[in-house]
């Protein structure tokens, strides 16, 4: 199970002083991927908060940057569930850039983000919602084998 977005325009305001895509924008792309993945699983991004008071803050985010991205490029990315734990999900994000100079998309970055089910009322982590786990198991059972 994965969520993909393609041909995202790189805005000039999303670049750093040297004209490269700012690292913070990759974080935003990860959040877009998380929201898209939830939607693809059948859940609005606010569903678990509104229904159960559960949010999904990030516990860990690891990025590897492999190629610079500029405003003349577009970005494609794919987000997938890599691992399902008791209280957390590990998500994999793969980013490619499309450039006028290159024939094929070029791998530009990889990220791994761990999000944790968090009980907003009691201010502590909690088991992942059962319906989320069941839906992921239906679509991506290998995420439970890790």
Language model features by range: what are they?
Residues 1-6, 69-74, 82-146:
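HotDog/MaoC-like acyl-thioester-processing domains
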Residues 38-90, 106-110:
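Hydrophobic beta-strand-centered segment that forms part of the acyl-chain substrate-binding groove
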Residues 1-59, 118-146:
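Hot-dog-fold acyl-thioester-processing enzymes
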Residues 16, 20-27, 31-35, 64, ...:
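Residue-level signal for functionally critical sites in structured catalytic/ligand-binding pockets
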